[in-house]
Swiss-Prot record:
It catalyses: (2R,3S)-3-isopropylmalate + NAD(+) = 4-methyl-2-oxopentanoate + CO2 + NADH. The gene is leuB. One of its GO terms (biological process) is L-leucine biosynthetic process. Its cofactor is Mg(2+); Mn(2+). This is 3-isopropylmalate dehydrogenase. Binds 1 Mg(2+) or Mn(2+) ion per subunit. It comes from Yersinia pseudotuberculosis serotype I (strain IP32953). It is found in: Cytoplasm.
Length: 363
């Protein structure tokens, strides 16, 4: 019997509902083509939930997500809610509690320069011509952002502030396995980022990663200091496949990877727990300035659906079909405004229609 999967859909604010509608079209297309049984339920989140329910993350939304196999998340936030206390604003009041509630410890951020989009890459033309396809695997719940003690004390010239970088062996082991398993599905290369020439936490990080690597003899492992990695990403990003990073280093490198692709509209992300449950979302923001204008790029949301199909549902064939459809659309010159330059731009809805059509046709 074919298993039925259930996705909790949280469109959110700004361009979220528009781009989510395009991902839903593409999901309908893979259902049709592959006979998948995937149901969806839509829930309020972020500013939209504040307006309707008085909370950025209503209990009904959390309950709906608990009943799902994965969460497809849009985007939250906007000027309308910036007057609220920080903990009640859409970003802090919705996304962070969801990550904590579902124990999402790993963040996966693909960054790829698609053929035909080299002119949007800020790197030198000969570097961009080589292309790149990088997956940044970032540990989300440990490290200096959460380590104790942290705080400020003293006064005057003796005032000081302090944070503590703490990593446990189990935290490093589980994120390392995510990186190695991901590399097996890609080009079988992991570059682990640390500062083991200075930091005790990085020395442990490197030791543990080396130990995990023994279980993956088919995956090549190398180590790189964070300062060198930031330089190498600019010098030759094509050398990288999977980047394995701590929380702080992953925060830095994932944004650098995003920048060199040339468009936030092409960047998905996934946050996973140990059971494979995940929250999938575009890496960009809610872009309230272009909401409702049919000009937002929906590809990041559709790429987030691809990650969901791969990592939470195990439907690689459906994910591959969507990926081919996106490639076909771009190769045929279809562009939303962020990618069109001086050329012809199509709208958000049109891009969704074209990609869904190519999925059904089996390009």
């Amino acid at each position: 019997m074919t298993k039925t999967y259930h996705i909790a859909v949280l469109p959110g604010d700004g361009i979220g509902p528009e781009v989510m509608a395009q991902a839903s079209k593409v999901l309908d297309a893979v259902r049709q083509r592959f006979g998948l049984k995937i149901s969806t339920s839509v829930y309020d989140v972020g500013g939209a939930a504040i307006d309707r329910h008085g909370s950025p993350l209503p209990a009904a939304t959390v309950a709906g997500c608990e009943q799902a196999d994965a969460i497809l998340f849009g985007s939250v936030g906007g000027p309308k809610w910036e007057h609220l206390p920080p903990a009640e604003q859409p970003e802090r009041g919705a996304l962070l509690p969801l990550r904590k509630h579902f124990k999402l410890f790993s963040n996966l951020r693909p960054a790829r320069l698609y053929q035909g989009l080299e002119d949007f890459c800020p790197l030198r033309s000969d570097i961009a011509a080589r292309g790149f396809d990088i997956l940044c695997v970032r540990e989300l719940t440990g490290g200096i952002y959460f380590g104790q003690p942290k705080g400020r004390e003293g006064q005057g010239m003796h005032e000081r502030a302090f944070d503590t970088e703490v990593y446990h062996r189990f935290e490093i082991e589980r994120i390392a396995r995510i990186a190695f398993e991901s590399a097996r599905k890609r080009r079988s290369k992991v570059t682990s980022i640390d500062k083991a020439n200075v930091l005790q936490s990085s020395i442990l990080w490197r030791e543990v990663v080396n130990g995990i690597a023994a279980d993956y003899p088919d995956v090549a492992l190398s180590h790189m200091y964070i300062d060198n990695a930031t330089m190498q990403l600019i010098k030759d990003p094509s050398q990288f496949d999977v980047l394995l990073c701590s929380n702080l280093f992953g925060d830095i490198l994932s944004d650098e990877c995003a920048m060199i692709t040339g468009s936030m509209g092409m960047l998905p992300s996934a946050s996973l727990n140990e059971q494979g449950f995940g929250l999938y979302e575009p890496a960009g923001g809610s872009a309230p300035d272009i909401a409702g204008k049919n000009i937002a790029n929906p590809i990041a949301q559709i790429l987030s659906l691809i990650l969901l199909l791969r990592f939470s549902l195990g439907k690689d064939d459906a994910a591959d079909a969507i990926e081919r459809a996106i490639n076909q659309a771009l190769e045929q010159g279809y562009r939303t405004a962020d990618l069109a330059g001086d050329g012809h731009a199509i709208g958000t809805h049109e891009m969704g229609d074209i990609i869904a059509k190519f999925v059904v046709e089996g390009v």
